[in-house]
Amino acid sequence: MSEERKVALITGITGQDGSYLTEFLISKGYYVHGIIQKIFHHFNTIVKNIYIKIDMLKEKESLTLHYGDLTDASNLHSIVSKVNPTEIYNLGAQSHVKVSFDMSEYTGDVDGLGCLRLLDAIRSCGMEKKVKYYQASTSELYGKVQEIPQSETTPFYPRSPYAVAKQYAYWIVVNYREAYDMYACNGILFNHESPRRGPTFVTRKITRFVAGIACGRDEILYLGNINAKRDWGHARDYVEAMWLMLQQEKPEDFVIATGETHSVREFVEKSFKEIDIIIKWRGEAEKEEGYCEKTGKVYVKIDEKYYRPTEVDLLLGNPNKAKKLLQWQIKTSFGELVKEMVAKDIEYIKNGDKYN
């Protein structure tokens, strides 16, 4: 007798993680259901890309999209009941750290209480013994870091409304796992990027700018704290770790990271190097600027408006537990990530793709 086909429900399917996870799960033979907000009725480029790839796999019938929102409990209950999933991946969030200072209540509602609403939907549908639940947690929980590198046992010290909301979600997952014996786990993912990263995030902001320079634009790139250091990986690698977490005998929380740290400054330099421009620096603090070593032309300046009210200076993850128990490995290096992002952004500009 053949094994019953698995059914996954993904919130945040229009984001970079959601799109890569969708493609990954369908390649594994899953039926995938995704929750999208009404504003995405036109199907943005990421959703289009999912459908294109699925068409190539001749598996378009494996993806169904539903209108919904993490702030609407009755809607979530209805979707969970209708879809009857075996796995739920909660990737939906207001995930921009700086925006969370301006929209703190909304961020808490979506990122914190949204997780609770999904867990309660699972329980109210009587599926707590059937559904495996993945919660997208974040390295921003560590904030003002208490130790280097950060592992599953490192104390949290959140430094933004986004991180505080995610800390609530983290602990409500732990609480429901222990109180109701649910298969629910947190993936504490360190920064992960891709050509599908939103254009307001610093990595994508950099690669889009560099691509523009390569295509003949004449502009200045304004950044905030270029000395901030992050552990950057590729989203395509990280979604496999999400899936692996739900394939274990018992639910556990895992740090997913590369174990390497790089500064925003280094990301800028590597991005420009992809178009044969060597960036040098002069000046200090907000007066610092990056210029082309060969021509002296200034390309990068500092703008204080991009500083966070409370900065997170260094994030460096320890992925040893995931490597040992999940047999998970990084496949894309930092250099390969930057190269892919710049190349794809050049392609986007040349193709006139306004949604990217």
From Swiss-Prot:
Which range is the signal sequence, renumbered to this chain?
Answer: none
- Residue positions of the active site: 138, 140, 162
- Copy the pathway line from the protein's UniProt record: Nucleotide-sugar biosynthesis; GDP-L-fucose biosynthesis via de novo pathway; GDP-L-fucose from GDP-alpha-D-mannose: step 1/2
Q: What sort of enzyme, by top EC class, is this? A: lyase
Needs which cofactor? NADP(+)
Keywords, ordered alphabetically: Lyase, NADP
A molecular function (GO) held by this record is: GDP-mannose 4,6-dehydratase activity
* UniProt-listed Enzyme Commission number(s): 4.2.1.47
- Keyword NADP among record annotations: yes
Q: Would you kindly state one Gene Ontology biological process term found in this protein's UniProt entry?
A: 'de novo' GDP-L-fucose biosynthetic process
Q: Which reaction does it catalyse?
A: GDP-alpha-D-mannose = GDP-4-dehydro-alpha-D-rhamnose + H2O
Q: Which residues bind NADP(+)?
A: 12-17, 69-70, 91-95, 106, 166, 192, 197
User: So what family is this one in?
Assistant: Belongs to the NAD(P)-dependent epimerase/dehydratase family. GDP-mannose 4,6-dehydratase subfamily.
What job does this protein perform? Participates in the synthesis of GDP-L-fucose, catalyzing the conversion of GDP-D-mannose to GDP-4-dehydro-6-deoxy-D-mannose (GDP-4-dehydro-alpha-D-rhamnose) which is further catalyzed by GDP-L-fucose synthase (ger). GDP-L-fucose is important for the synthesis of fucosylated N-glycans which are expressed on the cell surface.
Q: Which PANTHER family match?
A: GDP-MANNOSE 4,6 DEHYDRATASE, GDP-MANNOSE 4,6-DEHYDRATASE
Q: Know the name of this protein?
A: GDP-mannose 4,6 dehydratase
Please tell me the species this chain comes from: Dictyostelium discoideum (Social amoeba)
Q: What is the lineage of its organism?
A: Eukaryota, Amoebozoa, Evosea, Eumycetozoa, Dictyostelia
